[in-house]
Swiss-Prot record:
Mg(2+) 1 binds at D95, D99. This is Tryptophan prenyltransferase ComQ. It comes from Bacillus subtilis subsp. natto (strain BEST195). Its EC number is 2.5.1.-. Part of a major quorum-sensing system that regulates the development of genetic competence. Involved in the maturation of the competence pheromone ComX. Acts by catalyzing the transfer of a farnesyl group on the ComX pheromone. In vitro, can also catalyze the farnesylation of single tryptophan and tryptophan derivatives. GO terms for cellular component: plasma membrane. Coiled coil: none annotated. The lineage of its organism: Bacteria, Bacillati, Bacillota, Bacilli, Bacillales. It catalyses: L-tryptophyl-[protein] + (2E,6E)-farnesyl diphosphate = (2S,3R)-3-farnesyl-2,3-dihydro-2,N(alpha)-cyclo-L-tryptophyl-[protein] + diphosphate. Gene3D superfamilies: Farnesyl Diphosphate Synthase. Keywords: Cell membrane, Competence, Magnesium, Membrane, Metal-binding, Prenyltransferase, Transferase. GO terms for molecular function: metal ion binding; prenyltransferase activity. InterPro entries: ComQ (IPR033965), Isoprenoid_synthase_dom_sf (IPR008949), Polyprenyl_synt (IPR000092). It is found in: Cell membrane.
Length: 315
Protein backbone atom coordinates (compact mmCIF):
# COMPACT_ATOMS: atom_id res chain seq x y z
CA UNK A 1 0.00 0.00 0.00
CA UNK A 2 1.80 3.09 -1.23
CA UNK A 3 1.38 6.33 -3.13
CA UNK A 4 2.53 7.38 -6.57
CA UNK A 5 2.88 11.11 -7.24
CA UNK A 6 2.66 12.22 -10.88
CA UNK A 7 2.30 15.44 -12.82
CA UNK A 8 -0.69 15.63 -15.15
CA UNK A 9 0.92 18.06 -17.60
CA UNK A 10 -1.11 21.04 -16.39
CA UNK A 11 1.11 21.85 -13.44
CA UNK A 12 -1.11 19.84 -11.05
CA UNK A 13 -0.04 16.97 -8.85
CA UNK A 14 -2.09 13.81 -9.29
CA UNK A 15 -2.00 11.36 -6.39
CA UNK A 16 -2.54 7.72 -7.25
CA UNK A 17 -2.65 4.93 -4.72
CA UNK A 18 -2.15 1.24 -5.08
CA UNK A 19 -5.24 -0.66 -3.97
CA UNK A 20 -5.23 -2.43 -0.66
CA UNK A 21 -3.66 -5.88 -1.00
CA UNK A 22 -6.23 -8.37 0.28
CA UNK A 23 -3.68 -11.20 0.13
CA UNK A 24 -1.37 -9.21 2.39
CA UNK A 25 -4.22 -8.44 4.81
CA UNK A 26 -5.07 -12.15 5.06
CA UNK A 27 -1.41 -13.00 5.68
CA UNK A 28 -1.19 -10.26 8.31
CA UNK A 29 -4.24 -11.67 10.08
CA UNK A 30 -2.63 -15.11 10.18
CA UNK A 31 0.62 -13.60 11.46
CA UNK A 32 -1.25 -11.85 14.27
CA UNK A 33 -2.91 -15.10 15.34
CA UNK A 34 0.35 -17.03 15.08
CA UNK A 35 2.18 -14.51 17.27
CA UNK A 36 -0.50 -14.06 19.93
CA UNK A 37 -2.32 -17.38 20.33
CA UNK A 38 -0.25 -19.92 22.23
CA UNK A 39 -2.72 -22.82 22.31
CA UNK A 40 -1.89 -24.81 19.18
CA UNK A 41 -5.36 -26.25 18.62
CA UNK A 42 -7.01 -22.84 18.92
CA UNK A 43 -4.33 -21.32 16.69
CA UNK A 44 -4.93 -23.92 13.97
CA UNK A 45 -8.68 -23.38 14.11
CA UNK A 46 -8.43 -19.58 13.93
CA UNK A 47 -6.00 -19.68 11.02
CA UNK A 48 -8.33 -22.09 9.19
CA UNK A 49 -11.18 -19.60 9.72
CA UNK A 50 -9.04 -16.83 8.24
CA UNK A 51 -8.14 -18.99 5.23
CA UNK A 52 -11.86 -19.32 4.44
CA UNK A 53 -12.29 -15.55 4.35
CA UNK A 54 -12.77 -14.26 0.81
CA UNK A 55 -13.90 -10.65 1.19
CA UNK A 56 -12.09 -7.77 2.84
CA UNK A 57 -14.53 -4.92 2.22
CA UNK A 58 -14.23 -3.56 5.77
CA UNK A 59 -10.45 -3.30 5.44
CA UNK A 60 -11.04 -1.46 2.17
CA UNK A 61 -13.39 1.02 3.87
CA UNK A 62 -10.74 1.82 6.46
CA UNK A 63 -8.04 2.12 3.82
CA UNK A 64 -10.07 4.31 1.43
CA UNK A 65 -10.90 6.75 4.20
CA UNK A 66 -7.37 6.77 5.56
CA UNK A 67 -5.94 7.66 2.14
CA UNK A 68 -8.69 10.20 1.39
CA UNK A 69 -7.84 12.04 4.59
CA UNK A 70 -4.14 12.07 3.73
CA UNK A 71 -2.96 9.23 5.94
CA UNK A 72 0.65 8.33 5.15
CA UNK A 73 1.68 5.44 7.41
CA UNK A 74 1.17 2.28 5.36
CA UNK A 75 2.13 -0.07 8.20
CA UNK A 76 -0.34 1.57 10.58
CA UNK A 77 -3.30 1.30 8.22
CA UNK A 78 -2.35 -2.27 7.30
CA UNK A 79 -2.37 -3.23 10.99
CA UNK A 80 -5.64 -1.38 11.60
CA UNK A 81 -7.28 -2.99 8.56
CA UNK A 82 -6.14 -6.44 9.71
CA UNK A 83 -7.48 -5.83 13.22
CA UNK A 84 -10.82 -4.69 11.80
CA UNK A 85 -11.11 -7.80 9.63
CA UNK A 86 -10.39 -10.00 12.66
CA UNK A 87 -13.24 -8.23 14.45
CA UNK A 88 -15.59 -8.66 11.48
CA UNK A 89 -14.69 -12.35 11.22
CA UNK A 90 -15.55 -12.82 14.90
CA UNK A 91 -18.85 -11.00 14.33
CA UNK A 92 -19.64 -13.27 11.36
CA UNK A 93 -18.98 -16.36 13.48
CA UNK A 94 -21.14 -15.12 16.35
CA UNK A 95 -23.89 -14.22 13.88
CA UNK A 96 -23.83 -17.67 12.26
CA UNK A 97 -23.93 -19.41 15.65
CA UNK A 98 -26.83 -17.26 16.86
CA UNK A 99 -28.78 -17.58 13.60
CA UNK A 100 -27.79 -21.23 12.97
CA UNK A 101 -26.82 -20.09 9.50
CA UNK A 102 -24.00 -20.63 6.97
CA UNK A 103 -23.78 -24.31 7.88
CA UNK A 104 -20.99 -25.02 5.39
CA UNK A 105 -18.52 -22.82 7.30
CA UNK A 106 -15.89 -24.76 9.27
CA UNK A 107 -16.85 -23.08 12.57
CA UNK A 108 -20.42 -24.29 12.16
CA UNK A 109 -19.13 -27.87 12.05
CA UNK A 110 -17.59 -27.51 15.51
CA UNK A 111 -19.23 -27.88 18.90
CA UNK A 112 -20.98 -24.50 19.45
CA UNK A 113 -19.09 -23.95 22.70
CA UNK A 114 -15.74 -24.40 20.91
CA UNK A 115 -16.80 -22.10 18.07
CA UNK A 116 -18.07 -19.47 20.51
CA UNK A 117 -14.84 -19.51 22.48
CA UNK A 118 -12.81 -19.22 19.26
CA UNK A 119 -14.90 -16.25 18.14
CA UNK A 120 -14.42 -14.61 21.55
CA UNK A 121 -10.66 -15.09 21.22
CA UNK A 122 -10.75 -13.48 17.76
CA UNK A 123 -12.79 -10.54 19.03
CA UNK A 124 -10.48 -9.98 22.00
CA UNK A 125 -7.42 -10.24 19.76
CA UNK A 126 -8.91 -7.73 17.33
CA UNK A 127 -9.32 -5.19 20.13
CA UNK A 128 -5.74 -5.77 21.22
CA UNK A 129 -4.51 -5.15 17.66
CA UNK A 130 -6.62 -2.04 17.08
CA UNK A 131 -5.51 -0.63 20.42
CA UNK A 132 -1.86 -1.12 19.46
CA UNK A 133 -2.08 0.80 16.18
CA UNK A 134 -1.92 4.26 17.72
CA UNK A 135 -1.38 6.08 21.00
CA UNK A 136 -4.83 7.63 20.57
CA UNK A 137 -7.05 5.89 23.18
CA UNK A 138 -10.15 6.98 21.28
CA UNK A 139 -9.32 4.55 18.46
CA UNK A 140 -10.19 1.68 20.78
CA UNK A 141 -13.11 3.46 22.45
CA UNK A 142 -14.69 4.12 19.02
CA UNK A 143 -14.27 0.44 18.17
CA UNK A 144 -16.08 -0.55 21.36
CA UNK A 145 -18.77 2.08 20.78
CA UNK A 146 -19.73 0.83 17.31
CA UNK A 147 -19.35 -2.83 18.28
CA UNK A 148 -21.79 -2.30 21.15
CA UNK A 149 -24.25 -0.52 18.88
CA UNK A 150 -24.13 -3.40 16.41
CA UNK A 151 -24.69 -5.93 19.20
CA UNK A 152 -27.77 -4.01 20.31
CA UNK A 153 -29.08 -4.15 16.75
CA UNK A 154 -28.43 -7.89 16.72
CA UNK A 155 -30.37 -8.20 19.99
CA UNK A 156 -33.40 -6.54 18.38
CA UNK A 157 -33.02 -8.89 15.42
CA UNK A 158 -32.79 -12.03 17.57
CA UNK A 159 -35.74 -10.94 19.72
CA UNK A 160 -37.88 -10.44 16.61
CA UNK A 161 -39.16 -7.16 18.05
CA UNK A 162 -39.04 -5.10 14.83
CA UNK A 163 -42.47 -5.21 13.21
CA UNK A 164 -42.78 -2.12 10.99
CA UNK A 165 -40.70 -0.82 8.10
CA UNK A 166 -39.31 2.03 10.20
CA UNK A 167 -38.37 -0.37 13.03
CA UNK A 168 -36.60 -2.66 10.57
CA UNK A 169 -34.65 0.28 9.12
CA UNK A 170 -33.60 1.40 12.60
CA UNK A 171 -32.53 -2.14 13.45
CA UNK A 172 -30.47 -2.31 10.24
CA UNK A 173 -28.85 1.05 11.02
CA UNK A 174 -27.71 -0.34 14.35
CA UNK A 175 -26.75 -3.86 13.34
CA UNK A 176 -25.25 -3.37 9.87
CA UNK A 177 -24.79 0.40 9.82
CA UNK A 178 -22.59 0.36 12.91
CA UNK A 179 -20.26 -2.25 11.42
CA UNK A 180 -19.89 -0.26 8.20
CA UNK A 181 -19.34 2.95 10.16
CA UNK A 182 -16.60 1.43 12.32
CA UNK A 183 -13.85 1.03 9.67
CA UNK A 184 -14.73 4.30 7.96
CA UNK A 185 -14.53 6.30 11.18
CA UNK A 186 -11.37 4.50 12.34
CA UNK A 187 -9.64 5.13 9.02
CA UNK A 188 -10.38 8.85 9.28
CA UNK A 189 -9.41 8.98 12.94
CA UNK A 190 -6.08 7.25 12.32
CA UNK A 191 -5.30 9.78 9.59
CA UNK A 192 -6.47 12.94 11.38
CA UNK A 193 -6.88 12.24 15.08
CA UNK A 194 -10.44 13.57 14.76
CA UNK A 195 -13.94 12.08 14.75
CA UNK A 196 -15.94 12.98 11.62
CA UNK A 197 -19.71 13.22 12.05
CA UNK A 198 -20.43 13.31 8.31
CA UNK A 199 -18.55 10.06 7.75
CA UNK A 200 -20.67 8.41 10.43
CA UNK A 201 -23.88 9.73 8.88
CA UNK A 202 -23.28 8.51 5.35
CA UNK A 203 -21.78 5.20 6.51
CA UNK A 204 -25.07 4.30 8.21
CA UNK A 205 -26.80 4.56 4.84
CA UNK A 206 -24.16 2.33 3.26
CA UNK A 207 -24.98 -0.25 5.93
CA UNK A 208 -28.64 -0.16 4.92
CA UNK A 209 -27.69 -0.67 1.26
CA UNK A 210 -25.57 -3.69 2.16
CA UNK A 211 -28.29 -5.28 4.29
CA UNK A 212 -30.90 -4.79 1.56
CA UNK A 213 -28.54 -6.58 -0.83
CA UNK A 214 -28.33 -9.46 1.66
CA UNK A 215 -32.12 -9.57 1.93
CA UNK A 216 -32.38 -9.66 -1.85
CA UNK A 217 -29.88 -12.52 -2.02
CA UNK A 218 -31.77 -14.47 0.62
CA UNK A 219 -34.96 -14.45 -1.43
CA UNK A 220 -33.44 -16.95 -3.85
CA UNK A 221 -32.20 -19.33 -1.15
CA UNK A 222 -35.05 -20.79 0.95
CA UNK A 223 -32.61 -22.27 3.48
CA UNK A 224 -31.17 -18.83 4.25
CA UNK A 225 -31.88 -18.62 7.98
CA UNK A 226 -33.33 -15.10 8.07
CA UNK A 227 -36.13 -16.41 5.86
CA UNK A 228 -36.65 -19.49 7.99
CA UNK A 229 -37.15 -17.17 10.95
CA UNK A 230 -39.18 -14.80 8.73
CA UNK A 231 -37.33 -11.78 9.99
CA UNK A 232 -36.25 -9.55 7.13
CA UNK A 233 -37.51 -6.38 5.51
CA UNK A 234 -38.51 -8.48 2.50
CA UNK A 235 -40.61 -10.83 4.60
CA UNK A 236 -42.16 -7.85 6.36
CA UNK A 237 -43.39 -6.73 2.94
CA UNK A 238 -44.63 -10.18 1.92
CA UNK A 239 -46.68 -10.68 5.08
CA UNK A 240 -48.95 -7.81 3.98
CA UNK A 241 -50.27 -10.32 1.39
CA UNK A 242 -50.88 -7.71 -1.28
CA UNK A 243 -51.45 -10.45 -3.88
CA UNK A 244 -51.60 -14.21 -4.40
CA UNK A 245 -47.91 -14.39 -5.29
CA UNK A 246 -47.04 -12.95 -1.88
CA UNK A 247 -49.16 -15.63 -0.21
CA UNK A 248 -47.57 -18.35 -2.35
CA UNK A 249 -44.11 -17.11 -1.39
CA UNK A 250 -44.96 -17.03 2.32
CA UNK A 251 -46.09 -20.64 2.09
CA UNK A 252 -43.01 -21.54 0.06
CA UNK A 253 -40.60 -20.08 2.59
CA UNK A 254 -42.56 -21.85 5.34
CA UNK A 255 -42.08 -25.04 3.28
CA UNK A 256 -45.82 -25.44 2.94
CA UNK A 257 -46.04 -24.79 -0.80
CA UNK A 258 -44.78 -27.25 -3.38
CA UNK A 259 -46.07 -25.24 -6.35
CA UNK A 260 -42.72 -23.44 -6.77
CA UNK A 261 -40.44 -26.13 -8.16
CA UNK A 262 -37.48 -24.32 -9.69
CA UNK A 263 -35.58 -21.05 -9.75
CA UNK A 264 -37.51 -19.65 -12.71
CA UNK A 265 -40.83 -20.23 -10.93
CA UNK A 266 -39.40 -18.53 -7.85
CA UNK A 267 -38.16 -15.54 -9.86
CA UNK A 268 -41.59 -15.18 -11.45
CA UNK A 269 -43.37 -15.21 -8.09
CA UNK A 270 -40.91 -12.68 -6.68
CA UNK A 271 -41.54 -10.30 -9.58
CA UNK A 272 -45.30 -10.70 -9.34
CA UNK A 273 -45.33 -10.15 -5.58
CA UNK A 274 -43.65 -6.75 -5.89
CA UNK A 275 -41.04 -7.53 -3.22
CA UNK A 276 -38.08 -7.07 -5.59
CA UNK A 277 -39.36 -3.66 -6.64
CA UNK A 278 -39.96 -2.77 -2.99
CA UNK A 279 -36.41 -3.68 -1.95
CA UNK A 280 -35.02 -1.70 -4.88
CA UNK A 281 -36.98 1.36 -3.77
CA UNK A 282 -35.66 1.08 -0.20
CA UNK A 283 -32.13 0.55 -1.50
CA UNK A 284 -32.33 3.50 -3.90
CA UNK A 285 -33.63 5.75 -1.12
CA UNK A 286 -30.67 4.73 1.04
CA UNK A 287 -28.26 5.40 -1.84
CA UNK A 288 -29.75 8.87 -2.38
CA UNK A 289 -29.56 9.63 1.34
CA UNK A 290 -25.93 8.49 1.27
CA UNK A 291 -25.15 10.83 -1.63
CA UNK A 292 -26.84 13.80 0.03
CA UNK A 293 -24.94 13.18 3.24
CA UNK A 294 -21.65 12.67 1.39
CA UNK A 295 -21.99 16.11 -0.21
CA UNK A 296 -21.42 17.63 3.24
CA UNK A 297 -17.98 16.02 3.54
CA UNK A 298 -15.30 18.68 3.82
CA UNK A 299 -12.45 17.33 1.75
CA UNK A 300 -10.29 18.26 -1.22
CA UNK A 301 -12.46 17.77 -4.34
CA UNK A 302 -10.06 15.37 -6.04
CA UNK A 303 -9.86 13.15 -2.98
CA UNK A 304 -13.59 13.48 -2.34
CA UNK A 305 -14.52 12.39 -5.86
CA UNK A 306 -12.17 9.41 -5.72
CA UNK A 307 -13.60 8.34 -2.36
CA UNK A 308 -17.15 8.61 -3.70
CA UNK A 309 -16.32 6.38 -6.66
CA UNK A 310 -14.73 3.82 -4.35
CA UNK A 311 -17.69 3.76 -1.96
CA UNK A 312 -20.25 3.45 -4.75
CA UNK A 313 -18.39 0.62 -6.45
CA UNK A 314 -20.56 -2.47 -6.43
CA UNK A 315 -23.72 -0.68 -5.26
Amino acid sequence: MSHLVKWNGRGEVVIEQICLDSVRIKEKMKEIVDENILNEDLKVKLISFIKEKKQFSFAELAYYHYIAFDGKNDKAIELLASGIELLILSADIFDDIEDKDNLQASWMKLDPSIATNAATALYTLSLQVIGSVSNHPKLLSLTLQYSLQSLQGQHVDLNLTASSESEYIEMIKLKSGSLVTLPSILGVYLATGEYNETVEEYSRYLGIVEQIANDHYGLYYPNYNDFKTRHTLAFNYLKNKFNQSSIDLLNFYAQENHMINNLEDLKGKLRESGVIQYLNVIKNLAVENFKESFKKLRLDEQRKNKLLIQLLRGI
